[in-house]
Amino acid sequence: GLDENGVFHHQLVAAADTLNAGVHFPDDTAAYDIGYNCLAVNLSDLAAMGATPRWALLSLSLPQADAKWMQQFSAGFRSLAQTHAVALVGGDTTRGPLSISVTVLGCIEPGRQLTRAGAQPGDLLVVSGSTGGAACVLDMLKAGKPVSDRRMLDQPQPRVRLGQCLQGHASA
C-alpha cells in the first residue's frame, strides 16, 4: 500500500515465457487462443507467487504481416488482460518464425510472496485444478489423435485470485 507520503511499499515480481509455433502450440491454433494463452501462462506464474499482475510486455516474431491474424491475437490477449487489469506497456515485433515472448510484472507485499524455498519435508502438497492437461492435449494433437476439447491447452485459466488468497497460508 501507500504510506502517508505516497511511498509505494510493494515488491515488484516478474515472470517471462516464450511460446513457439509447433513446440508450445500446434500450427493450426487460432490466433485468439495464442494471444490468450501467451498471457495466461505468465499470469499463472504470478499466481504461483501470490502476486497481483499489473503490466505486460509482449514481443512477437511473425513470418508475415497479417491484419486479421493480429486482430484476433490482440482480442485474445486483451480479453484476459482486461479480466486481470493488466496493462500492455511495451514490447517489440520482428519478422521470423512465429514466436511470442511475454513478460508480466506484478506487485506483492514484502515477505508475502509464495516461493518453493518455503517447502519442507512432510508438508501437505495441494494442487488446484488438474496437472499435465495442456501437455497431454498437445501430445495428442502432435500424434494426430482426436481431441474433443482443447481448452486446457488453448485457454488455461490462471488462478490469480487463489494465489493471492494463499498468501500467509502456503509456502509455495
Where are these regions (language model features)?
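Helix-biased detector of long, well-ordered alpha-helical tracts
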Residues: 1-172
